[in-house]
Structures are given as structure tokens and as C-alpha cells.
Amino acid sequence: MPVVTMRQMLDNGVHFGHQTRRWNPKMKRFIFTERNGIYIIDLQQSLGFIDKAYEAVKATVAHGGTILFVGTKKQAQEAIAEQATRVGMPYVNHRWLGGMLTNFQTVSKRIDRMKELEEVDFDDVAGSQYTKKELLLLRREKEKLERTLGGIRNLTKTPSLIWIVDTKKEHLAVDEAQKLGVPIVAILDTNCDPDEVAFPIPGNDDSIRSVSLLTRVVADAVAEGLMKRHNGKSNAAEEPMAEWERELLEQHEEQKSQDAAPAEQSAPAAEAPAETEQKDAPAAE
């Protein structure tokens, strides 16, 4: 059973690249054709790369690794938070702070500050040592820290792999990952540099539907890796499965039973819709 089908990718617009004037020549080998001034990505190749990325993520997690989900553009924020949370992995979906990986010691101090503020009862003015104005300022500080660092509150070490949506926008994350030798799994749109990514997935990184589909696939790989990790622990008679892992297992089994239905008919890349659907317009940053 494939982790994703050609039909799913076509239906979610994974094949739409950027306008032909906005491209990286290094992506030429991943382009199927050009239609109405838009590059069409070769989804047959994408399927193969998805399988490789899926296996890499699954194996990494099965051996105890952590996957950091990164996507701060509007089209990716919801999917990044939702899927990372579903599988208990850290994520960054609002703003990448410089040094988030390379200067983690400083970032961890900000995380400690956030946790400290979360202990404050902002509704109990009389019982606190702060004035109303001070509590208001502290609440704003807490909310700002939670937006930026809430997704990595439990990250204690360098992640084993990083899933990135839009490597051009997340160039700071890419640079830091490369400095630390952390492999990158990422969607490669036609304007990206494939040399920056260890496990590329040629596809549309501007469409909410495309980003959601591919991020879900990566999260599914994490889920499968967690199951494999737990099975290994069970054989070694180690600690029992955590509650969230048990829920994840139940969801995974339910999904497998649903997928047992006849597989959707695959369509070759050449059968991409003739009309060129416009990508979701990038939201203002």
C-alpha cells in the first residue's frame, strides 16, 4: 500500500510549480513540463522521493530520533502544528529565531522563562506581587514566547532530522541544520536548491492542500517509527507505552483498516489536468 497515491497528489495540486521566470535551474531534472507559464513537477519522481523520505523518517524515529517540523509561512502553520502535535514531535510554525539550533543554550533559557511565566496566575491580582500593568506586560511576554517557542518546549537536544516547508523562506533553519550536520527532509518547489536537502520531495510548497498532504505523510512516517520503537521496547521489557502513544496506535490501526479498501486508481504524471490551477497566493508575511 503506497503512503500516498498519484491521484491524491494531483487532487491536492502537488504538481504545480512556480512561474517559469521564478525557478532554480538545478530543479530542471524534477520538472515534467511547462503549462501556461507554470512549471509542472514530475510526480512519478516525487512518488519515489516520498518513499525514500518516508523510510528515512521512520527509521530515524524507530531508533529513538526526534523530527523537528518547521514551516512559518501562513500556508504551513496549521498543518505543521497539527501534525507535529499528533505524533508528539517539536515544531516551529511562527518565527525561526536565529540560533534556535546553533545557540540552543540561550534559547533554552527563553523556554525556561516561558515556563516560569506559565506558572503565574494572571487573574489573581490581589494575591500576586505584581500590579495590573505588570501582569498585563507579563501576559504579553508569555504569549509572545509561547507563539515562538511553545512548539519546542520539550526539545532538549539537537533534532535528528528536520522537516521543512519552503527552504527559501526557512533559510536560517537550513543554514543552522547544515552547520550542525542535521539532515533535512523538505518539499522542493521549482525555485528551491536541491543541494541543500538530504531527502527532497519535489512538490508545491505554496498550496495549503499540498503542504498539508505532504506534512501528514511525514507525520505518518513518524507514527510508524514510534510503533516500531515501542515494539522494540516491548521485546526488551522496558517501560509501558505512554497514553498519547496508545492513542496514536489506535488512530494508526483505524487508518490502516480504512486504507484496506481498494486503492485509488493511480494516474501518470502526463495526465495532469490540462487547465493550470493557480497556486494558493502566498500570504503576506
UniProtKB/Swiss-Prot annotation:
A GO MF term: structural constituent of ribosome
Pfam families: Ribosomal_S2
Ribonucleoprotein found in the keyword field: yes
UniProt keywords, alphabetically: Ribonucleoprotein, Ribosomal protein
Compositional bias segments (type: Basic and acidic residues): 243-257, 276-285
Entry keyword Ribonucleoprotein: yes
Biased composition (Low complexity): 260-275
CC per GO annotation: cytosolic small ribosomal subunit
Top-rank taxon: Bacteria
GO BP field: translation
Region: Disordered, residue numbers: 229-285
NCBIfam families: rpsB_bact
Homology family: Belongs to the universal ribosomal protein uS2 family.
Official protein name in the record: Small ribosomal subunit protein uS2
Species annotation: Kocuria rhizophila (strain ATCC 9341 / DSM 348 / NBRC 103217 / DC2201)
